[in-house]
Amino acid sequence: MNQNQLPKRSDEPIFWGLFGAGGMWSAIVSPAIIILLGILIPMGIAPEAFTYDRIMAFSQGFIGRIFLLLMIILPVWCALHRIHHTLHDFKVHVPASNWVFYGAAAIISVIAIIGVFTL
């Protein structure tokens, strides 16, 4: 290798970071939200805490919007990164696969940002 030649920088750490964050979010936070929305609220546990007005007020506040974005964006990046590498492991070669999968995740993220901030 020539002394003047710099090694090629990889963009993979960025995607692995989003993959890891999405995996942790999906494993820790999502089950709690599923229990809350799928079991506790329908059973009527603490109905005064989970009224429509309070949930809408939370989701329209800054912290609520960030929470909604994290609930949407991080699992999407995790899933598309996992699909990308699973196809690679199975020797299914998608042309320009980085652009396809990470581009799709970026587009979905932008759509989520627009959707959450127009809520």
From Swiss-Prot:
InterPro entries tied to this protein: Fumarate_red_D, SQR/QFR_C/D
Transmembrane segments: 27-47, 61-81, 99-119
MF (Gene Ontology): succinate dehydrogenase activity
Biological process, per Gene Ontology: fumarate metabolic process
Keywords from the named record: Cell inner membrane, Cell membrane, Membrane, Transmembrane, Transmembrane helix
Pfam families linked to this entry: Fumarate_red_D
Topology relative to the membrane: Multi-pass membrane protein
Main location: membrane
Subcellular localization, as worded in the UniProt entry: Cell inner membrane
GO CC annotations, alphabetized: fumarate reductase complex; plasma membrane
HAMAP family assigned to the protein according to its UniProt record, in alphabetical order: Fumarate_red_D
Family: Belongs to the FrdD family.
Biological role stated in the UniProt entry: Two distinct, membrane-bound, FAD-containing enzymes are responsible for the catalysis of fumarate and succinate interconversion; fumarate reductase is used in anaerobic growth, and succinate dehydrogenase is used in aerobic growth. Anchors the catalytic components of the fumarate reductase complex to the cell inner membrane, binds quinones.
Description of how the protein assembles with itself and partners: Part of an enzyme complex containing four subunits: a flavoprotein (FrdA), an iron-sulfur protein (FrdB), and two hydrophobic anchor proteins (FrdC and FrdD).
Protein name (record): Fumarate reductase subunit D
Native organism: Proteus mirabilis (strain HI4320)
